[in-house]
């Protein structure tokens, strides 16, 4: 596992409100040096989310999808299904820009 890797997520039961439900992918956004911790920080994706400056569009398994950096979550690695490869460098840079915007981090 590494930062920028895309995994099929195993959805939890009982989502509420605006939490993402159903089958989807997640992008690992946690720094590689901390991947040995008991959880991993994931940004879920959605093909139905509305466009926004903080939702970079990436291609996963031949389909355009948006990375929902405003819905980051720490998940147990057992919730990660099959790997679907890595985001490209430009895609990962766009995710980083969105994280800076959503988290209010200065560059």
Model-derived features: positions:
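Conserved functional hotspots at enzyme active or ligand-binding sites that engage polyanionic ligands
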Residues: 1-107
């Amino acid at each position: 596992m590494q930062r920028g890797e895309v995994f099929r997520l195993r959805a939890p039961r009982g989502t509420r409100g605006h939490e993402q439900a159903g089958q989807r992918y997640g992008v690992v956004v946690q720094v590689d040096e901390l991947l040995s911790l008991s959880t991993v920080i994931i940004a879920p994706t959605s093909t139905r989310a509305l466009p926004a400056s903080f939702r970079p569009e990436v291609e996963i398994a031949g389909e355009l999808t948006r990375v929902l950096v405003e819905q980051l979550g720490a998940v147990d690695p057992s919730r990660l299904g099959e790997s679907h490869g890595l985001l490209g460098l430009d895609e990962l840079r766009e995710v980083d820009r969105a994280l800076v915007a959503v988290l209010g981090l200065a560059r």
